Amino acid sequence: MHPKRSSQGDGSVTKPVRTSDRLRRRPKLHGRSYLYYSSPNMLHNRKRNTKTRTAASQIAKMLHKGNRPARASNAAPIASDLRRSTRKRRISVNLEDYTDSSGAEDEDMMSPAYRTLRRRVHKNFSTSKSRKDMDAELAPRREGLRPRRSTTIANKRLKTESGADQDTSEEKDGQDETENGNELDDADDGENEVEAEDEGNGEDEGDGEDEGEEDGDDDEEGDEEQEGRKRYDLRNRAEVRRMPTGEINKQQQPRSPRRVLHQGMGTRVGRDGRRGGSRPHKRHRFTRTDDSDDSLLVDELDQGPAIPWARGGNRSGAPWLFGGLDTYGSSSLGLNVGASGWGHQSDGLAALTSGVQTAGPSSKGGADIQPLQINEDINFDDIGGLSEYINDLKEMVFFPLLYPEFFASYSITPPRGVLLCGPPGTGKTLIARALACAASKAGQKVSFYMRKGADVLSKWVGEAERQLKLLFEEAQRNQPSIIFFDEIDGLAPVRSSKQEQIHNSIVSTLLALMDGLDSRGQVVLIGATNRVDAIDGALRRPGRFDREFNFSLPGCEARAEILDIHTRKWKHPPTRELKEELAATCVGYCGADLKALCTEAAIRAFREKYPQVYTSDDKYAIDVGLVNVEKSHFVEAMSAITPAAHRGSVVQSRPLSPVVLPCLHRHLLESMSLISDIFPSSATSSELTKLSILTFGSAIPLVYRPRLLLLGGEGVGLDHLGPAILHELEKFPIHSLGLPSLLSDPGAKTPEEALVHIFSEARRTTPSILYIPMFNNWWENAHEQLRAVFLTLLEELPSNLPILLLATSYGELSDMEEQSVFDNRSVYTVDKPSSEDRSLFFDRLIEAALSVISGLNGKPDGPQPLPELPKVPKEPTGPKPAEVKAKVEAEQHALRRLRMCLRDVCNRILYDKRFSAFHFPVTDEDAPNYRSIIQIPMDTATLLQRVDTGQYLTCTPFLQDVDLIVRNAKAYNGDDYAGARIVSRAYELRDVVHGMLSQMDPALLTYCDKIAAEGGPSLIPDDLSGSILGLAPVVQMGTVTRTSARLRNVQPEVNLDRDYEGLKKPKKTTDAVSIDSAADKSQNQDSGQEMPSPDAANPQSAAPSPTDGDREDQSEPPSKEASAEDMSGDSCKGPAAKSDKEISSRTESVKGVFMERTDNYSIPQMERLYTRIMKGVLETLDKGLRDDDNNPKHSILRFLSEFAQHQANF
């Protein structure tokens, strides 16, 4: 039966020759140019070996858990579990008849790879000899291959137990074999190469497995493929529709026209085709399994549409109906689909995916590595109070560019990194922007890159590190450059076990980029943070951040400078005295707070000047120059603003209030004198510091444990004096050690931990101040451990370390228990106010009481009616020139897109030979009687001409002309058999045109219908055809009287200058009257100065005019009244002088009574007395205003005298 088989006989086993895939392919029956060798019994063997199928019921019975056979051996699975590259290849022909006697090394290729299950089991289980042959043929062809699970042994076990039902399944198996053969024919018909396939897939699979990139995820039984290659969700993004085995057509079918249209007449399927059925399925490029993640991030869709009429072009789009017209004609003109009006269904994927990244950044990884465009209006002159830091930044950026020879001569590298730390609003970001702007103006362009906090963070693993690397590489290419990391604590936090691993990786990458093996070049790094303790400590060393600038809150002089910067562009800036007073008052204000203060004060001044704008929606004609910002506006603004430093913590420093200033000013001066002696850092000059330096880096100690205790009894004003001293020393960092501060520290769990943290921070920011309010209570209530920690930390401080310990304590010096901390020389005793202090206090009190009158005199008695302001004439309600031009451009663009689509349709029809009868007009030679039958001829060329001339505003007239072609064909050809073909082509033409126009963008069609409904496209007027910017002067000149009169050809016969002055003068006086009616006395004087000078030069010409109104009565007597006042001035001096003497005498008497009553008064009692007296003064003035009191000073003095006479008030 099989005389050539090597597994039979008694002789030595001869192994077959390794055959190639070309010989193992089954012969094709449609004319392939291959030479196949076959034996006479080839077809007979194939027909006989078909009835080997096991019934499904028997297979289910054998698969039952109790009926499963034991594993036969371990060698077989290992031998059969091979990688895909060495799997047994299924062969569709029987090559058993080919032998070779050259050697026995390739025995595995002798037995046919495509054989029914029954023959395989019979062969492998007949004898032990054949079992050895089976082990040999399953051995790998080379060593080191990874085993794979196979289903061959399971099939053998199933067949061993299926002998009872073999006869019942032979018929069905024959049918299946025939069907599988058909599928193999179809699969081989579409591919010229034999694909590697696992032997255990069985005969039911009609297509082989791909070599590595095609249809690994499209197999119906892909268990082996799943084992061989891991499956990634990111790589297999596209959804693959899997067809059940039962739905696959089991019979050989001829190629349909649709299949020919999709893939052509050839038999080869491209690498984007998917096999497994009767036709290949086109797969999008994004669904290939060989695309890696990186390629998906940066690659774009490269499947461009082809020219529609090119016969050899790639028709990747869907066909136009059945006419062979595709949808990509728009691209042939160099336009994309979005620019034309097409909106085909198959364009959705290309339009959405072309140029769009699927899972990440762009070609640069999504990193915003372009240099930042800096506002050139910002410079160092706009920054106040940071002059020393500005010079340090210039050393880092400008000097290496301007003076490189200095650094080269000393072989040093200039500092390349600086860390800006400080409270919010102190100018960290502003100084970086000013530096970038100034660097660009220095002569050589400096690139500026800015990153804010966690901008570089990404959800993709490793993307943040990649963006940092790209940023540094780009900065090195464009050096000199500056990289500014704003809020760097969010990018490089402290690395710890509690922190996320992603931050640790980012910090490590940043550290390596800042100071790694590669030189950074001329790249300056600037980091800004208000949480310097939150960033990683490895950043804060030379080589990375070489310098640290601590931006503290601005001092008094710095605040005055900042106020001057923000108000120097005002028309009426505040006086120097006012700015110094505001700077002294705004304690704890940062630069941003001072800017907000100026803004709020200006808005309040505008609200006071023009309150009418808040009650009307109309725009008034206002004069901005009349708005003047005064001190009261700043005071109101300060009450509405909470400084940023006051929100997070309590500010300990504040100046002395005007109430207690007379009583404590003497103690403040004496305390500051003591501090200047024990803490010379507050007054030490740079020259003195240079003289104190000795050899070997040592210096003369100028400080020895600076400590000061303010000691006094109850009511001496220590709660005012301590903060006032801190206010004078506000340029130094102040750290509070009070019990509330220790207990409220969010970063400490115990007071001892908070105390240690404050001491370490004070040592880091020397010179600094440690402040302990109410030290006696602190020492009494602190437990022993806290005291021990406090004393230990004090002793650990070096004796010459400039850290001032300032404390306040109530009690006597003899009773003080904390002598171990403060010695007698470090104690300053504060006593109660003396008689001189109280005398000065009451002088200020009476002065303040009398000054209230001057503030009330300028205010009206009640609410006054607001004057009406002239309204600005409303602009024409018509569209603006820019809107008209934009509308015209939009309409022209829409009509252009419509013409492109219609022109494309006409060109497609002209290139289609099926409609050649309708391409051009019918000539008389072709049909002499055509003109007599058809009154309105129509053809494709005429349609194209009308499209080019813009006669179609919508698709409706175009379709009407296409319908006219159909009607003309029916009318001329009639119902005869000869013309029926032409009429049918006309109907086909109309259907094709309708089909193509249905693919257009619906929004475009709707917009074109709107244009047609409005009467056609809008036209640009002649005056708008030029530049729109030139229209404004023309409109303004059109409002002038002389210009309009000249345009109307009016001959002016009068003197234009005189007439213009006559018309202009009443208008100005009328406006002045309307404005002056609501202005105060000082503003009336200002408006009076703006009157025309001719009236002032000629007093006689100041005759009453109808426009003067209420001023008519005051126009004649001013000279007489002025002369009368001048004559009576000397006589009035006598009574006025007597009145002033009487007031001063009464004031001294009231003051003497107050001095007697307030003997031995404390500071709180003086404050309470001040408050009661000022409240009574205000009530007295209010009562005097209601009673029409003509002399409020006497009323105030009478109240003060009565108040001092009553003993109960003291």
Swiss-Prot record:
Binding site for ATP: G422, P423, P424, G425, T426, G427, K428, T429
Pfam families registered for this protein in UniProt: AAA, AAA_lid_3, Bromodomain
Ranges for region Disordered: 1-32, 63-291, 856-883, 1057-1151
Compositionally biased tracts (Acidic residues): 97-109, 167-226
Keyword Plastid: no
Biased composition (Basic residues): 276-286
Basic and acidic residues bias locations: 130-146, 227-244, 1057-1070, 1108-1123, 1138-1151
Keywords associated with the record: ATP-binding, Bromodomain, Nucleotide-binding
Residue stretches of biased makeup (Polar residues): 1-11, 1080-1090
Domain (Bromo) ranges: 897-1000
GO MF term list: ATP binding; ATP hydrolysis activity; histone binding
Protein family according to the UniProt entry: Belongs to the AAA ATPase family.
UniProt name for this protein: ATPase family AAA domain-containing protein At1g05910
Source organism of the structure: Arabidopsis thaliana (Mouse-ear cress)
